[in-house]
């Protein structure tokens, strides 16, 4: 999902970095003898193929010029798999890579599971009975897709993709989110990628690909061309836009070098990392956005302008022990300096928030905002009684506490480490325990005394089995995606955390689709105990999709 409204803002803010992708320009780039490395996060492709075959979403019959002939039950999943492979095929033909990396979402950190749970509770089966929640690790649907692709990728490499030397495939049994597995691959293969002078192309529409690309290109793979290829959603045809990450880095640097007070030495890495941290604060898949700080009211523009005209960096360097490919080595890393972040949070509270309040006062669209209504009624700024009222509007037991604010700051640090240094360096169990964020003023005060309790530490690669994750994220109407007897647990013994009826939070949203389901917190210890008590009753066949596997490397016979 990424960051709402971000790419629209991005195109307006950095138009020089976005171009229409054409085969002509691609060929011109290939003439430089830089082989292409193509990386695909397949989940977006899988969702599109499912919509196309099962006729929902963008492919509902009402949105089509004519109806397709009926497809009989039992054939449809295979048609989805074929369509996914066809989409991969077309991208390989378009980019002509030397190497290809394909990833499907595996089990995710708990912080991401919370967002996945919200999305799955608001999905509904199609008229034909298709449940898009099956696009989750541990389901029969994704397991069979992985087997299908493994078989057919070998055939494609041998008979059709003659310019491709190697395919790296990570299916849904390999732990980690798809896009993060792609960037873990880049970090792991850094030396070889740099030495080969690969031209890196990442395909996907998620806004957070821009953040991941910026960080990997400024901290690890600094010289290689790196671009994001994404569908042009404004085009009626299947056109692509190319986002030039190297040019984006240069543009951000030029803005800073022109406006920002000089430092000795001037640090390019800090500026890029600071930009990413500021973008995180408008909300993402792991954190609710800071109230009244959003893109559509101009909040991010104001914060960036303040940053580029103010002395100081948000990030700094520290020496830490690394894990993964540099295990045991002590190396410099970038981290957030929360005392340096404090002035920016204070600026949001004192300058950005009043602009949002004024916009809200004058706008005639969108849904009411509880916090803004209280502010306007009291004709006061964001004092403690106002923010407490804001949180109490959702739960009589929900109070803003120092612990909650510190959890939010810990999560910002966690997200930065995850995006900058990968899944091996984060605590997979960490999460922010609320659907609502503290205000900028609360965060500003907290940073003055905040001392992080977490660091860059090695964690187990995966702390969650696929079936356990399904128990945590699936709604009751999708219980059939779990095998016996786990499906019965969901609807009989775990009903407290899996309600059939839910309320939606529309507070301050511009559109209905932005609403967030208000769900009860999960008792993970209770779920884990029941899971451990019943998992041995699952069949051996079902348990095949509840394991962790490793990356598959498929190499061509022909030498390159």
From Swiss-Prot:
Keywords: Exonuclease, Hydrolase, Nuclease. It comes from the Viruses. The keyword Secreted does not apply. InterPro entries: 5_3_exoribonuclease, Xrn1_helical, Xrn1_N. GO terms for biological process: nuclear-transcribed mRNA catabolic process. GO terms for molecular function: 5'-3' RNA exonuclease activity; RNA binding. Its EC number is 3.1.11.-. Gene3D superfamilies: 1.25.40.1050, 3.40.50.12390. Belongs to the 5'-3' exonuclease family. This is Putative exonuclease 059L. It comes from Invertebrate iridescent virus 3.
């Amino acid at each position: 999902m990424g960051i709402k409204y971000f790419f629209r803002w991005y195109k307006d803010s950095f138009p020089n970095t976005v171009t229409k992708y054409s085969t002509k320009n691609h060929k011109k780039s290939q003439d430089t003898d830089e082989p292409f490395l193509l990386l695909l996060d397949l989940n977006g492709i899988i969702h599109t193929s499912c919509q196309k075959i099962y006729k929902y979403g963008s492919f509902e019959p009402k949105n089509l010029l004519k109806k397709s002939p009926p497809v009989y039950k039992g054939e449809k999943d295979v048609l989805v798999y074929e369509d996914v492979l066809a989409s991969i095929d077309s991208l390989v033909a378009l980019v002509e890579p030397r190497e290809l990396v394909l990833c499907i979402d595996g089990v995710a950190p708990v912080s991401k599971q919370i967002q996945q749970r919200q999305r799955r509770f608001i999905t509904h089966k199609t008229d034909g009975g298709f449940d898009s929640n099956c696009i989750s690790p541990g389901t029969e649907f994704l397991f069979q897709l992985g087997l299908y692709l493994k078989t057919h990728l070998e055939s494609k490499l041998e008979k059709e993709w003659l310019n491709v030397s190697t395919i790296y495939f990570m299916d849904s049994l390999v732990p980690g989110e798809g896009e993060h597995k792609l960037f873990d691959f880049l970090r792991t293969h850094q030396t070889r990628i740099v030495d080969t002078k690969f031209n890196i192309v990442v395909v996907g529409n998620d806004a957070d690909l821009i953040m991941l690309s910026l960080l990997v290109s400024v901290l690890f793979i600094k010289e290689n061309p790196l671009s994001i290829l994404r569908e042009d959603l404004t085009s009626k045809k299947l056109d692509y836009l190319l986002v030039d990450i190297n040019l984006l880095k240069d543009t951000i640097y030029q803005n800073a070098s022109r406006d920002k007070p000089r430092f000795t030495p001037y640090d390019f890495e800090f500026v890029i990392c600071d930009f990413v941290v500021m973008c995180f604060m408008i909300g993402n898949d792991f954190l609710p956005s800071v109230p009244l700080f959003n893109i559509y009211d101009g909040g991010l523009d104001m914060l960036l302008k303040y940053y580029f005209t103010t002395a100081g960096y948000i990030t700094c360097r520290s020496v830490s022990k690394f894990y993964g490919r540099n295990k045991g080595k002590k190396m410099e890393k970038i981290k957030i300096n929360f005392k340096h972040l404090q002035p920016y949070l204070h600026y949001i509270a004192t300058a950005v928030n009043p602009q949002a309040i004024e916009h809200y006062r004058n706008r005639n669209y969108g849904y009411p905002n509880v916090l803004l209504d209280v502010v306007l009624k009291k004709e006061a700024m964001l004092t403690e009684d106002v923010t407490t009222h804001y949180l109490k509007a959702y739960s009589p037991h929900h109070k803003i506490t120092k612990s909650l604010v510190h959890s939010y700051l810990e999560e910002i640090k966690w997200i930065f480490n995850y995006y900058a240094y990968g899944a091996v360096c984060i605590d997979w169990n960490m999460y922010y325990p609320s659907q609502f964020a503290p205000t900028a003023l609360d965060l500003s005060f907290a940073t003055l005394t905040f001392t992080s309790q977490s660091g860059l530490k090695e964690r187990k690669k995966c702390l969650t089995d696929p079936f356990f994750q399904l128990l945590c994220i699936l709604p009751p109407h999708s219980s059939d995606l779990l095998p016996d007897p786990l499906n019965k647990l969901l609807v009989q013994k775990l009903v407290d955390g899996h309600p059939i009826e839910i309320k939606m939070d529309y507070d301050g949203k511009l559109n209905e689709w932005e609403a967030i389901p208000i769900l009860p917190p999960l008792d993970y210890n209770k779920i884990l105990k029941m899971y451990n008590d019943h998992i041995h009753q699952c069949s051996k066949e079902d348990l095949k999709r509840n394991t962790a596997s490793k990356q598959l490397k498929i190499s061509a016979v022909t030498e390159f």
